[in-house]
Amino acid sequence: MACRCTQLQDTIDEVATQFYSSIHYLSSHHDFVPLPGQEKVSDSKVNPISAEELQFAQRDLAKDLVTKFMQIDTLINQLPGISTAPKHQLEKIKKLQNSIEEKQLERKSLESENEDLKLQLAKRIETFGRLSCVLFQP
């Protein structure tokens, strides 16, 4: 599962797409209303639907947008640290920094131990090579 920030960004992208799609749908399916004293105009790119269908579509699109915004709100509330006071967040950061420093020291110690073991192994291989040359010489 993706992290909360990624989910939030994906949901924001989805709501932006929904906004665009809603505006495009409504602008291509509305009916033209003439201004007083003018004739009703038309556009070949617009395929008008009835007023009832348009209202239903508007409500449906609005519900979808509200649902998406509720998902965004839920994701924001689930972000780490949202319900934590800044003081507690700083304490947690300090603990994590100390933990990182301890792990770095442990890593250096283990790297040093690893180098020592490599040297010991190299010496033993060298000793074994000399002994096998002496023992198996004709």
Swiss-Prot record:
Q: Name one Pfam family in it.
A: Med21
Cellular location(s): Nucleus
Q: Indicate the principal place this protein occupies in or around the cell.
A: nucleus
What GO cellular component is one of the record's annotations?
A: mediator complex
One annotated GO molecular function: transcription coactivator activity
Record's keyword terms, sorted: Activator, Coiled coil, Nucleus, Transcription, Transcription regulation
**Keyword hit for Transcription:** yes
Any coiled-coil regions, as ranges: 87-128
The record's Gene Ontology biological-process terms are: positive regulation of transcription initiation by RNA polymerase II; regulation of transcription by RNA polymerase II
Question: Is DNA-binding found in the keyword set?
Answer: no
PANTHER family linked to this entry: MEDIATOR OF RNA POLYMERASE II TRANSCRIPTION SUBUNIT 21, RNA POLYMERASE II HOLOENZYME COMPONENT SRB7
The entry assigns this protein to a family as follows: Belongs to the Mediator complex subunit 21 family.
The entry's function note states: Component of the Mediator complex, a coactivator involved in the regulated transcription of nearly all RNA polymerase II-dependent genes. Mediator functions as a bridge to convey information from gene-specific regulatory proteins to the basal RNA polymerase II transcription machinery. Mediator is recruited to promoters by direct interactions with regulatory proteins and serves as a scaffold for the assembly of a functional preinitiation complex with RNA polymerase II and the general transcription factors.
Q: How does this protein assemble?
A: Component of the Mediator complex.
The name under which this protein is listed is Mediator of RNA polymerase II transcription subunit 21
Q: Which organism is it from?
A: Schizosaccharomyces pombe (strain 972 / ATCC 24843) (Fission yeast)
Q: Which gene encodes it?
A: med21
